Amino acid sequence: MVAFLSMYQIMVSAQCYTADQQQSWLQKAEAAKPTIKKTIHHPLQEVSIVKDVEAFQGYKAVKVGDIKDLYIQSFKQKKEVVVDFGEHLVGRVSFKIKDIGGMQDAVLRFKVTFGEVPSDLALPVEPYTGGLSRGWLQDFICDVSYDGSFQFSRRITARYMKIEAIGTSAYSDFCFDNITFESTTSAGLSKVKLADSTPMIFKDIARVSENTLRDCMQGVYEDGPKRDQRLWMGDLYLEALANTASFQQYDVTKRCLYLLAGLANPRNGLLYSNMVEYPTPHAQNSFFVDYALSYVLTLDDYLKATGDVATGLDLWPVVKNQIETVLSQAIDQNGLYSNTSYQYPGMMFSTVFFDWSPVALDNHAAIQGLLVYTMEHALDIAKRIGTTAEVKDYPAQVKRLRAAGKKAYWDAKQKLVLSGKEKQNSYTGTSWAILGGIISGKDAQSAIKNVMRNPKAIKPGTPYANHFLVQAMLNCGLKQEAKDYVEQYWGGMVRLGADTFWEYYVPDNHLFSSYNGYTLLNSYCHAWSCTPIYFIVNYPEVFQK
C-alpha cells in the first residue's frame, strides 16, 4: 500500500538528528527564554455564586457586601467568602491573617477553592469521574501557622477564590490582613490598534483574545495555564499567529520551535505532539500527524514575521523530516493518505487529531488537505532560506495529491466534501479541503454553504477546528459569513461573560466536556481559542468596519 517504505526504512537506519545537533537546539531554546513579567493584584469585590438559568453553565457571580469588611471583621464568625479579582489571572497566590481578639493559639485550617468561572465554585466535585488527574482541580486544605501567612506552592489560574474556615480556635479571633495574586506572563504590551470604525463586539472579542493569549504565554506557549500547562504543537501554531498579530513576542515562538526540535525522536526525526517545560523540558511520547505538520506552518509564520533566516536554515531538516516521512510512509499508490490509523515506526502512539467531536470524525479529507497546505508552506520557507533545490519535486507532488483528494472526496453533484468509506460530511473535512486547494472558487463556497445546511454534518467541537473553518471561509471569499461566524461563536462567549476564551464552547450544551463529561476539568483559558485577534487584525476590511 505504501510507496517508498523500504527506501524510508533504509534512510532512518541512522540518526536523523545527532546528539550535538539536538543539544544545540535546546541551548538555543534556553537562550530565547522570555522574561516573565509580574503584577500584583488584590480582590476587587466580594461576590456570591448564585444559580441563573440564563448564565453560562447556570451560575453567575453577584456582588455582595464590601471587600473592605474582609480586612476588619471577624472571619471566624463569617466562616466563608468568595472574592473576585475582577479578571482572569495566572500566577502565585498568598494571604495573611491578623488577630483581632485573643492571640492565635492554634493552627488555622481553611478550605480554599479557585475558579476560572463561577460554576467552578458551584458544581459538585465528588464523585470524581474525570479522565485526567484529579490534581488538576484547584481545591486545597491550607493550614496557617502562628506567623499568620500562607502561600500556595503551585501556580494558580483563576478569577474567583472561595475561602472556608474549617478549623479555628475557641480562644482567638482573626480577620484577613492581605490577599495577593501575583500574576505572570511573558507577553508585553499589545501592538494592536483597531480602527475607530470597528464594531464594539469585535473590539470586545479582540480584547478577550489578547487576554487568552497573555495568560497562556508563560515560559512557553501553554495550551491552558490551569490544565494542561504544556506546549502542544497544534496550539503553538494558533498562538504564534495570534502573537504575530498582537504582542509580537517572537522569542517565545522561537523558543518553542527549538524545544520541540531538541526533544524530537532522533532516529526517525518525528516531532512529539507536546512537551512539558518543568522540571526540565521533556516530551510525551505520542505522535499527532496533523500537529507535526503544523510545525511547518509555525516556522513559516515566524520567518515571515522576523526574517530570521538563520533559524529557518537551522530547523529546515525538521521541516523536511515531517513532510517526507508522511509522503514516504502514509501515501498510497493512488496519492491518498488512506489509513489515518497508520502507526509510524519508532513512535509509541500515532494518531490524526484535528478536533474533539462527540461523533467519531473521519479525517481522511482533512489530512489530505493539510498535507498539501503544509507542502506549500514548506515551499515558501525554502524560497526564504534558499533551499528550493531540495524540494523541487514538491510542486508536482502537490498537484498529484490535490487531484487524488478531489477524485476521492469531492462530490461534484451534491457539492459536498465526503470523507472516508462512510462518505462523512464534516465542517473540518470541508475546511481543510478548501485550505489545501482540493476545491476552490465557487465549489469551495458551495461546499461551506452546503455543509452548514446539512443537519447530519459533523460540526466542530472546539475553537481549534472553528479557527480553520473561518480561515477557509476567508480563503474562498465568504467574508460576510466569516464575520458572522466569529461574531456568533466567539462573540457568544463574550456575551456569556468570558474574560478569556474557553477550551470548549458548544452553544447548545454549555456543560460539554470530553473528560467523561466532568465539566470541572475543562479549561476556561485555552490557547486554541485565542485566534480571533489574528482575523480581526489581518482582515480589517472584514472585521474593522
Residue ranges and their predicted role:
Residues 1-16:
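Bacterial Sec-dependent N-terminal signal peptides
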Residues 3, 84, 150-152, 228, ...:
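Residues embedded in well-ordered secondary-structure elements
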Residues 15-223, 235, 251-254, 271, ...:
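Extracellular/oxidizing-compartment recognition motifs
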Residues 191-198, 226-229, 241-244, 361:
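Second-shell loop/turn segments in exported
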Residues 223-224, 228, 535:
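Short, surface-exposed recognition loops or helix-turn segments adjacent to catalytic cores
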Residues 232-545:
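Active-site core of glycosidic bond-cleaving carbohydrate-active enzymes
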